[in-house]
């Protein structure tokens, strides 16, 4: 008989075969990697290509309001970048989340209005992935801290609106953030999320 109480296992010797089997299983339990350990060991260093995910590891973004943490994957290659206007000048878009670039991008791209940067991101199909988006300003801040060398010089658009006429942008070379006129053409670089 096997009894489990308060995480303690008691084996009775009534069936030596069953007792030996359970004892062998329990003996190897400490050596077996947990699912979390196995997932963590597969995470490449920040800035390295993440095989099968379509780009480079941009770092771990903390979830907001109890939401799950996620890894930012930074798109690679010529088709992952563009120079575009943010769009929607003199419009209050509602894309004001400073942390949820995915929601901002979807809102802008599906609005039926002209938002070139968000539409570029929303339509992207890169490395077999179709969930690319324009990062929110806090996601840009994380990328600026972790992998500034992976960005070209100059300001890049975020998906976060600042006001009716301005949107947030990030300078990865110097780490500064500011706002620019939505009609201005700036760099765009796509990201996606990976939850583990």
Give the location of each predicted region.
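Short, compositionally biased
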Residues: 1-128, 182-184, 192-196
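C-terminal, surface-exposed recognition/capping segments
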Residues: 1-19, 129-131, 137-196
């Amino acid at each position: 008989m096997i009894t489990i109480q308060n995480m303690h296992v008691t084996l009775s010797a009534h069936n030596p075969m069953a007792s030996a089997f359970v004892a062998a299983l329990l003996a190897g339990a400490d050596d077996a990697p947990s699912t979390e350990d196995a997932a963590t060991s597969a995470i490449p260093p920040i800035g390295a290509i993440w095989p099968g995910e379509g780009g480079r590891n941009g770092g771990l973004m903390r979830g907001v309001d109890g939401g799950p943490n996620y890894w930012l994957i930074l798109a690679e290659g010529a088709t992952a970048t563009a120079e575009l206007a943010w769009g929607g000048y003199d419009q209050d878009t509602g894309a004001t989340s400073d942390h949820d670039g995915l929601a901002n991008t979807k809102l802008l791209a599906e609005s039926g209005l002209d938002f070139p940067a968000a539409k570029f991101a929303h339509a992207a199909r890169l490395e077999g992935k179709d969930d690319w988006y324009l990062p929110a300003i806090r996601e840009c801040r994380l990328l600026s801290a972790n992998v500034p060398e992976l960005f070209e010089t100059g300001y890049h658009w975020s998906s976060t609106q600042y006001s009716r006429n301005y949107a947030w942008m990030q300078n990865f070379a110097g780490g500064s953030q500011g706002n620019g006129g939505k009609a201005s053409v700036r760099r765009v670089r796509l990201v996606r999320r990976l939850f583990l």
